[in-house]
């Protein structure tokens, strides 16, 4: 991290320690935005810095208007009463293939059905868990703007197996039910695993938690033709199954949609909404698409990362020479309107084999050997300028809105970036109901590290990118070329600098500096 100047205030030292703890997220899943507030007048105008060749590109238009003209309203406090369902087959760390059907009632009770599958398209159900309990919504989250914190109590868990093979496996794993000893489990029957009334709990072997209910965000999307889509985001699941029970969410899973107000093209929504534990949803079979990275890919929405970090991503892949370029735009707000910093990275990649661990996934190895950073607000400029030594570009030379190459200094110590860097990635592709190609890459490790060994390769995915251009421009961007900007701001690693302020609050409340 480097030592602070002797006259650096002790509090600023805490900021640096806090920022270093969170800024270690590198490469494809890079980074996060930040919580540090800033006046919009301090942000550099993105349009004035936009590269000419990107002005009219479809990718730029997509990144400039992620909502595609729709009006999005976040409701606080969140009224989550209703029936909420998955929009597709979800992949959780492990991996686990799952669909969800959650009902929340006016009296604070909930009934959650989690359907588990043998395959990555959710066509072969193996068992269903029915979880009943109570939830109480608390204050607005201080980690993620627009989110609400919640507390929950599980009162009842029931399991239903959908094959004899699964019944035998679960029966051996749990070795008890609340009805007393069972000789053997049978498919199609419900087995009580937890009962608040009797004090029985046979569910520990499932490693089940509903900590996702500790963080919620409700959005209403008003589309052009008057249709309203309601989306409920629940807290993320830790990538390490051994940490799942203790994890308090700081980002989100894929959104659930209201069973009455979902996207009209959502086939999975309709199937899941009318399913139950005795008749689990079976989604339409689909073929796995071969992962073809060639072209340009961009974020579909303002993405949320752990600790309330926000960003947009734009990747360019060159299949002819297996090189890649990445633009990361970081923000301090969940609408991606207040920029903090941007980062440009490039390197090489190698195409691997089909994953033996994650059905439908393909393994890649990515190397990053070139990086440029552009601070987009004053706090980050100060953060970058205060470090001793030429370990993050030229010492003391950072200016607002001016890009600097950090390759010669082997990255940027201030931001926790080391070059060269290697990551072991997981990808999959699919086509949505509108015919668009979507690209998923591996979820970042929940402990804040990077997947720099094969053993740390992801078993689940981040939010998808959409192909916005089938071909890619020839060659890398050379020194002196403008970083493409997007209206509303551009930010990658800068948001992490702002996150330092939020983490400072944590440090000051948890331990002395």
Regions found by a protein language model. Name each.
Residues 22-61, 67-76, 288, 483-486, ...:
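N-terminal signal peptide
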Residues 46-50, 55, 65-76, 80-83, ...:
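N-terminal glycine/threonine-rich, aromatic-flanked beta-hairpin/loop signature
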Residues 54, 176-212, 219, 257-279, ...:
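Eukaryotic intrinsically disordered, low-complexity regulatory regions
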Residues 111-113, 150-152, 225-241, 322-327, ...:
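Short, hydrophobic/proline-enriched secondary-structure or compact coil segments at domain edges
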Residues 470-500:
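C-terminal GPI-anchoring signal of eukaryotic secretory precursors
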């Amino acid at each position: 991290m480097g030592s602070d100047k002797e006259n650096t205030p002790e509090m600023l030292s805490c900021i640096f320690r806090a920022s270093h703890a969170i800024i270690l997220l590198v490469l494809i899943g890079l980074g996060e935005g930040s919580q540090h507030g800033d006046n919009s007048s301090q942000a550099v105008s993105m349009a004035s810095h936009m590269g000419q060749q990107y002005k009219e590109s479809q990718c730029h238009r997509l990144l400039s208007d992620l909502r595609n003209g729709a009006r999005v309203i976040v409701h606080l406090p969140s009224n989550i009463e209703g029936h909420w369902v998955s929009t597709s087959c979800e992949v959780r760390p492990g991996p686990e293939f799952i669909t969800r059907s959650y009902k929340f009632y006016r009296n604070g009770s909930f009934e959650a059905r989690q359907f588990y599958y043998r395959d990555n398209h959710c066509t072969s159900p193996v068992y269903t868990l029915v979880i009943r309990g109570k939830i109480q919504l608390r204050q607005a989250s201080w980690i993620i703007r627009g989110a609400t914190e919640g507390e929950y109590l599980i009162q009842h868990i029931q399991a239903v197996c959908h094959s004899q093979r699964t019944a035998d496996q679960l029966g051996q794993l749990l070795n008890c039910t609340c009805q007393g000893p069972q000789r053997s489990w049978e498919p199609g029957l419900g087995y009580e695993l937890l009962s608040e009334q009797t004090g029985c709990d046979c569910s520990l072997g499932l490693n089940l938690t509903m900590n996702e209910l500790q963080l919620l965000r409700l959005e209403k999307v008003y589309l052009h033709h008057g249709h309203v889509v309601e989306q409920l985001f629940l807290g993320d699941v830790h990538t390490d199954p051994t940490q799942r029970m203790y994890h308090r969410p700081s980002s989100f899973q894929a959104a659930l949609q209201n069973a009455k107000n979902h996207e009209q093209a959502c086939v999975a929504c309709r199937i899941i909404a009318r399913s139950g534990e005795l008749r689990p949803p079976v989604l339409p079979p689909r073929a796995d698409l071969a992962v073809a990275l060639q072209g340009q890919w961009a974020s579909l929405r303002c993405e949320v990362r752990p600790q309330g970090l926000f960003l947009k991503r734009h990747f360019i892949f060159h299949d002819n020479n297996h090189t890649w370029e990445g633009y990361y735009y970081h923000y301090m707000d969940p609408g991606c309107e207040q920029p903090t910093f941007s980062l440009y990275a490039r390197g090489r990649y190698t195409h691997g084999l089909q994953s033996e661990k994650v059905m439908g996934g393909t393994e890649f190895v990515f190397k990053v050997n070139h990086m440029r950073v552009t601070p987009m607000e004053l706090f980050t400029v100060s953060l970058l300028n205060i470090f001793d030594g030429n370990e993050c570009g030229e010492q003391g030379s950072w200016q607002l809105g001016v890009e600097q190459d950090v390759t010669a200094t082997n990255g940027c110590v201030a931001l926790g970036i080391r070059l060269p860097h290697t990551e072991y990635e997981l990808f999959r592709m699919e086509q949505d109901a509108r015919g668009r190609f979507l690209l998923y890459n591996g979820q970042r490790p929940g402990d804040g590290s990077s997947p720099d060994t094969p053993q740390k390769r992801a078993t689940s995915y981040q939010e998808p990118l959409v192909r916005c251009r089938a071909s890619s421009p020839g060659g890398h961007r050379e020194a002196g070329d403008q970083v493409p900007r997007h209206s509303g701001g551009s930010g990658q690693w800068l948001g992490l600098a702002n996150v330092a302020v939020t983490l400072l609050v944590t440090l000051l409340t948890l331990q002395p500096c």
